[in-house]
Amino acid sequence: MGRIKKKGTAGQAKNFITRTQAVRKLQISLPDFRKLCIWKGIYPREPRNKKKASKSSTHSTTFYYTKDIQWLLHEKIVDAFREQKALEKKISKALGRGDAHDAARLERNASRPEKTGKTKYNLDHIIRERYPTFIDALRDLDDCLSMLFLFANLPSTSTVPAKMIARCEKLCLEFEHYLIVSNSLRKSFLSIKGIYYQATIQGQDILWLVPYRFNQRVTGDVDFRIMGTFVEFYQTLLGFVNFRLYTSVGLVYPPKFDKARDDQDAGLGAFSLEGNGIGAIEQPKQITNGDASKPDPKLQAEIDKLMLQLNAPEKEAEETSKTSPDGEEEEQATETIDKFEPAAPGGDILMQPSYSATDPSTLFSKFTFFLSRETPRQSLEFILRAFGCKRIGWDAVLGEGAFTHNESDPSITHQVVDRPPMQVQPEEEEEIKEDNQTAQRLRPGARIPGRIYIQPQWIWDCINDEELKRPDLYAPGAQLPPHLSPFVKKVRGQYDPSAPLQDQEREDEELEMDSGSEDEADVSDDETAVKKQDPLTAMDVDETAEGMDVAGSDDESDEAPEKADESFGGFSEAEESEDEGETAALRRQRELEAELSGVALQEKEVDPRVKAKTDAKKKAAKKAKEEDEELERSKMMMSRKKRKILEKMVYSNKKKDAEAEALRAKRRKIEKSGKAAPRE
């Protein structure tokens, strides 16, 4: 007979381990165990049967894989945690003995990252383990940037030391400098949560959130210890990424940092970038003893001859490009672009490549901006520099690093204002004109001729659309256009607020709206015709009514049929047939009258627009009916499972179409009301 297996040596009891057992096995504290699991990417598991997985009688809630805990036993940081734990025990024993001098000596050797922001251990090897390639690190950079930008804007507290905040801010500014140099920033969006940014680095789209620079109130219900563990890991990760990015574009990392300028809130201006020659084209330097050796004249002549032969095709291409007109160049360029069309009629719309007339990296290169005091200086400066602007000025209150602090500088072309327009008082103009040479700040509401005044949204809309928008739409006090998210992907059939309404409407939808408006117009015309009835005929009717006793005797007899008609709504088909019979009888009577009088019957003139609309409506209805019949025939050939799936798809598509149609109807109503308002 085989031996009886002991309980807890096989199955789920062997594969899973509780958190208490894991902490006891690693011989570290619970906070250190949490840190280690976060850094190594180990998270709790849920066994199928908790009773079988638990070796004790008590109900355990948190389980881990036994292999994961076994893997943590070989981690280098565990030794540092054990040393710290032993040091904490020595400090507590010294305090218990009353030896304050020995406790202070041991405290100086202890690691306090929550106070100093420095640790005795290194996370470099963990970064290399979790991200074997640089692309893997870029893919996981979204949460890293969002967390570090959040901590860079927090106030310093006991749980969030000032050194940690300064380290986060420094890493974020270094990353922004790379985006400015490499022109990698693509889009940005203003939301309630903060400002979203999207950059493309080595083909990877990175999206992160930056909070607005308001005074933050730190509450006690947030566990900053866990967040601080993530920040400690993300600081090391972003340091690796920044080093790799800087070296890829030929810059020295870390860049020079001016602490004095940073104390004056210079921001990006506190860093000075230096190139180390990587990626730069330089002439090779020859090391000699002081006398430069002259090249062989024969060898030099042969080299020059070969260079002329190599450069001949390039010169011919330049000459042909100069002789050809610009229009032909554009046609040739556009013909070389491939157009990607969806394989199926209901497929998603693919992004089409196109030649842009303006380079996004030089969108603001020709302008000089001045930022008013009420505008978000840090975000505007970053976006403007990332899209080619070199000259940005702001008020001295906003900090150092500006191109100019003089608001009346004549070189300023655009001024960003985020305040309501104020009326200029003419009495104070003379006093300010006298001291115009020394004044650096204009009074509120004053404007300089020749300068464009815009609201901050103009900059965001320009970079998202990769073109300069009309500045008059974003003037101070103007009703701003809707600020739409640039991260939404276009899907066929979905409502697109940026596209014209005519391009999104279905043919039958537009015809239905037109027919509805025509019916309303006909009803209004009938009402006006009744109101404008001839008074003579009205008098005749009244006189005849007075002469007849049956018609004018009882008002109740007249009201009774009306009430009956209102209450009863049946026999609709019978009423329609009666109406058709009345129209046929009237037409027959007109034909007889025309035949007796010997005059040809005059047909009513039909409006060609109405006829075209009715024909198109019939055609659309016929097409929809054919599509429904084709769908029903195809469903008959399907199995029950596939038929159910198809019905779910059709239902969801109809629901989406109904939502899009409701949004289009709302937009159509708004546009019509906007067009009709000026006429009144």
UniProtKB/Swiss-Prot annotation:
Gene assigned in the entry: nop7
HAMAP family, alphabetized: Pescadillo
PANTHER family with a match to the protein in the record: PESCADILLO - RELATED, PESCADILLO HOMOLOG
Family per record: Belongs to the pescadillo family.
Coiled coil start-end: 611-673
InterPro entries: BRCT_dom (IPR001357), BRCT_dom_sf (IPR036420), PES (IPR010613)
Record note on quaternary structure: Component of the NOP7 complex, composed of erb1, nop7 and ytm1. The complex is held together by erb1, which interacts with nop7 via its N-terminal domain and with ytm1 via a high-affinity interaction between the seven-bladed beta-propeller domains of the 2 proteins. The NOP7 complex associates with the 66S pre-ribosome.
GO MF annotations in UniProt: ribonucleoprotein complex binding; RNA binding
Protein name, UniProt field: Pescadillo homolog
Keyword tRNA processing: no
Protein's organism: Sclerotinia sclerotiorum (strain ATCC 18683 / 1980 / Ss-1)
Ranges of biased composition (kind: Acidic residues): 505-527, 540-559, 573-582
Compositional bias segments (type: Basic and acidic residues): 602-626, 654-664, 671-680
Keywords: Coiled coil, Nucleus, Ribosome biogenesis, rRNA processing
